[in-house]
UniProtKB/Swiss-Prot annotation:
Classification via NCBIfam families: NDH_I_M (TIGR01972)
Lipid bilayer topology: Multi-pass membrane protein
Domain of life: Eukaryota
Keywords, alphabetical: Electron transport, Membrane, Mitochondrion, NAD, Respiratory chain, Translocase, Transmembrane, Transmembrane helix, Transport, Ubiquinone
One GO CC annotation: mitochondrial membrane
Gene this chain is encoded by: ND4
Chain's role: Core subunit of the mitochondrial membrane respiratory chain NADH dehydrogenase (Complex I) that is believed to belong to the minimal assembly required for catalysis. Complex I functions in the transfer of electrons from NADH to the respiratory chain. The immediate electron acceptor for the enzyme is believed to be ubiquinone.
Broad class of the protein's primary localization: mitochondrion
Protein name per Swiss-Prot or TrEMBL: NADH-ubiquinone oxidoreductase chain 4
Database matches in InterPro entries: NADH4_N, NADH_Q_OxRdtase_chainM/4, NADH_UbQ_OxRdtase, ND/Mrp_TM
């Protein structure tokens, strides 16, 4: 674990040392090295609850897949950004790469931290680099408004989380997660106090995911962010909220959790349905993919709030699968944007006549996004569906409709980008190249691994 943290930190430092002509090759090679090192975490993934232990860091079956996902997608996001960022001067290029590696280091620290204070610091460290990526390298003037939305939503959610951590320390006299699980003093406190803690602790995570009702910052941030920002935001940063819920919900197995989880689950299911309907009315391709992320994260949150092992396993599986697929969708949307200069669905159409191989990638990613077998999305959604129906049979029609509308908008993306007639006023469309196909391929390789071995990310 320490080797992984040190490697990412040293890579961040070397970004400012290497010669200009070696900047991108060395950064990509270093990020690939981090990915290879992270794969070693799978060796003892299922042998014990905590492993790779040090004083403040450890991994377990919950954090290991998310660390590997973070490390895997950073080199892909760098390769996807080369065409855009190479037009800037070398200082801006070094700054951009440094911000990406800062986010990676903060993510590894967040997912491996045993202390709640270190978890909070690393959790909030991702804010500033992401904010800079959006405001500095966004495509349009609206990026400043998107940055303000992102900043204030995150800050509003962060303060209650900090108060919760301080309160936990004052009662438990420790903020180390294994120690809190052992003492379990919170369960003996009054239900009013634990209910307030429950709400304060989880509001930061449901904003970060986000679920419907706390999501207004996400479409703006996605639409205005550069491709690396969109890929990292969709694939990894949204999973911080889900990881926070998975980490802290065992601390609150109290009467308050049994009291507050049912309305939270119902709200998440309803939000998933509403968001799926909103997706059908979008005219911007990136906004549509962003709203689909809100819908998927609402389903993930409903699985976690169900407080069942099936729901938690389904949530973790869907988080990993959605991270890969949403990143691939944003990457494909960027490939079309680089060729026609717009994200409007009425213009971004008919590309199967110009780039037929991209149609294959669109088909695979959209099919995976709607959850057809044998994709991991189906496994996650089925596990959550079973957990929700077991929780309350009356919720079955709502979550089923949300899933059906999710399939409809996934097919809408595929149909509008490929099957319509190609606009006559567009000309000189560049053909795709090998590096672009390689990007999508490396998004799909982990999906094949999960199809062949889904138990790799399931918890006991």
């Amino acid at each position: 674990m320490i080797y992984l943290i040190l490697t990412s930190t040293l890579t961040l430092a070397t970004t400012w040392i290497v010669p200009r002509n070696l900047l991108w090759p060395s950064s990509i090679l270093n990020s690939i090295l981090i990915s290879v090192i992270s794969l070693n975490l799978l060796n003892n993934h299922s042998t014990s609850l905590w492993h790779n232990l040090s004083l403040n860091f450890a991994t377990d079956p919950t954090s290991t897949p998310l660390i590997i996902l973070s490390s895997w997608l950073v080199p892909i996001s760098l390769i996807a950004s080369i065409n855009t960022i190479q037009n800037h001067n070398h200082i801006n290029q070094r700054t951009f790469i440094s911000l990406v590696f800062t986010i990676l280091t903060a993510l590894i620290l967040t997912f491996s931290s045993l202390e709640l204070s270190l978890f909070y610091i690393a959790f909030e460290t991702t804010l500033l680099p992401t904010l800079t990526l959006i405001s500095r390298w966004g495509a349009q003037k609206e990026r400043y408004q998107a940055s303000i939305y992102f900043l204030f939503y995150t800050l509003i959610g962060s303060l209650p989380l900090l108060v919760s951590i301080i309160a936990i320390f004052s009662y438990e006299n420790t903020i180390i997660l294994p120690s809190i699980h052992l003492t379990n003093y919170i369960t003996s406190l009054p239900i009013t106090l634990t209910s307030i803690w429950w709400i304060f602790c989880f509001i930061a995570f449901i904003i970060k995911m986000p679920i419907y009702g706390f999501h207004l910052w996400l479409p703006k941030a996605h639409v205005e962010a550069p491709i690396a920002g969109s890929m990292i935001l969709a694939a990894i940063l949204l999973k911080l909220g889900g990881y926070g819920l998975l980490r802290t919900i065992p601390l609150f197995y109290t009467p308050s959790s049994l009291l507050l989880s049912p309305p939270a689950t119902a709200f998440c299911i309803w939000g998933a349905l509403i968001t799926s309907i909103i997706c059908l009315r979008q005219t911007d391709l990136k906004a549509l993919i962003a709203y689909s992320s809100v819908g998927h994260m609402s389903i993930v949150a409903s699985g976690i709030f169900s407080l069942s092992l099936w729901g938690i396993n389904g949530a973790l599986t869907l988080m990993i699968a959605h991270g890969l697929i949403s990143s691939a969708l944003f990457c494909l949307a960027n490939l079309l944007y680089e060729r026609n200069g717009t994200r409007t669905l009425s213009i971004t159409r008919g590309f199967k006549m110009v780039t037929p191989l991209l149609t294959l990638w669109w088909t695979i990613t959209c099919v995976a996004n709607l959850g057809l077998p044998p994709t991991p999305n189906l496994i996650g959604e089925l596990l959550i569906l079973v957990a929700i129906i077991d929780w309350n049979t009356l919720s079955a029609p709502i979550i089923t409709m949300a899933t059906v509308f999710g399939a409809i908008y996934s097919l809408l993306i595929l149909s509008s980008t490929n099957n319509s007639s190609f606009p006559q006023f567009l000309s000189n469309i560049q053909p795709t190249n090998t590096s672009e196909h390689t990007l999508i391929t490396f998004h799909l390789i982990p999906l094949v691994f999960l199809i062949l071995n889904p138990s790799a990310i399931l918890i006991g």
